[in-house]
Amino acid sequence: MDIRATEQTILNWTGETLALGIFEGATELTEELGELNERLGGTLQELITEEEFEAKTGTSAVTRLGKDSPIRKLILVGLGKPEDFKLHSLRNAAANIARSAKKLKIKTLGISLPVFNNAPTLTTGAIVEGVLLALHTDLRFKSEPEDKGAKLETVDLLGLAGQETAINQAQIICDGVILARELVNGPANSVTPITMAQTAETLASDYGLTLTILEQEDCEKLGMGAYLGVAKASDLPPKFIHLTYKPEGTPKRKLAIVGKSLTFDSGGLNIKVSGSGIETMKMDMGGGAATLGAAKAIAQLKPDVEVHFICAATENMISGKAMHPGDILTASNGKTIEVNNTDAEGRLTLADALVFAEQLEVDAIVDLATLTGACIIALGDDISGLWSPNEELATQLKTAAELAGEKFWQMPLEEKYFEGMKSPIADMKNTGPRAGGSITAALFLKQFIKETPWAHLDIAGPVWTDKEGGINNTGATGFPVRTLVNWVLS
């Protein structure tokens, strides 16, 4: 698909289908819309009147035009009230347009949406993201493709001439999001620690990244007892993935992104029972998938920042070699952990990954993980939890998320709650009381960071959706690749 920035407007563009965004309360046609209505022989006003189109957020209306018209079809999308208009409103409007175009089997499309906050570059990026991410469907495991018939070939962004760089950047970021989506969507017999390592190898080869993969023996030498305690039950070997992007010159700063990478989580000997969603546990590597997706985008965007991407990939399985409830593991920083629940395994893998990341002497570390159901109970499916003892880093991430339209809510690191994590026979347990479970999980991870500014993102809710909406289709969302990329670029 060719996405083009053009100086043409709704008054002189010709093509198969024109899509317009209209604000609620602005359905009386004046100025440019009035001129367009005349150009289309009154069809625009007829569509608004006959469909009783009020331009509420998420609504749309479609009509066909006469054979003599310079445009064959017209799509209207509602933008809601002007005072509620945000950058993400553009993404959702573009997604709405893209789905309508797909349903109508449109080949050429002109999109006219308002410029957000006098920022054509941000506007262009948001529209491109909305179109590309809404059109992405993962059909790799279908025996016969369901997408038949004509497909969208050309999209003209009207009134946005000169924004080719913004289009290219948005396409690169979307490629990273789609990589993350497809890794999470892939079943556990397709996406394994081995294939995650192979994906990292492909990224390194294609985009000039440096790759180190630590095998089990390497991890043993580094004392990664927490990570290996989880990994030992699986017949598949663990793969500790370390990708590095380095700019050509001296980096302005050094960052580490650490993604939880459990390619399947059975719960271990504390097995997930029927009704616990065990069949969805292929998504438990959503943090690692987003880490690799961000790596793909950042390697092509080439910021003046050194970035380390770390995925401690493994499965959490059941076998005669599995860790037992009550086992004591020693992490690579020497701290001991009493395992009182083998289904709280992600934090064990992250413990050694965080120690490894800090030893790289980076300026900041962000970990992301589908870590707790408690975070979903607290914040729902659409909002990720954010914990950080460093307010500057937390603010950077929230700003990056706002730009991406990805939702985060900063949660407290209530130190008192760690009392419930203390063990009489080890330095700590891996779970605490039920209350405040997402907070105690973050406090557990905090024990493996000494001084480096650090943030923890619990993405258990937003990494997956069971319903189509906005830029997301059913399945993996690729959350929060765009936030991570924005953070690095900032």
UniProtKB/Swiss-Prot annotation:
Active site per UniProt: 272, 347
Binding site for Mn(2+) 1: 265, 343, 345
Superkingdom of the source species: Bacteria
Record field: catalytic activity: Release of an N-terminal amino acid, Xaa-|-Yaa-, in which Xaa is preferably Leu, but may be other amino acids including Pro although not Arg or Lys, and Yaa may be Pro. Amino acid amides and methyl esters are also readily hydrolyzed, but rates on arylamides are exceedingly low; Release of an N-terminal amino acid, preferentially leucine, but not glutamic or aspartic acids
Note accompanying the cofactor annotation: Binds 2 manganese ions per subunit.
EC number, as in UniProt: 3.4.11.1, 3.4.11.10
HAMAP family noted in UniProt: Cytosol_peptidase_M17
NCBIfam families: PRK00913.1-2 (NF002073), PRK00913.1-4 (NF002074), PRK00913.2-3 (NF002076), PRK00913.3-5 (NF002083)
Protein name: Probable cytosol aminopeptidase
Organism of derivation: Gloeothece citriformis (strain PCC 7424)
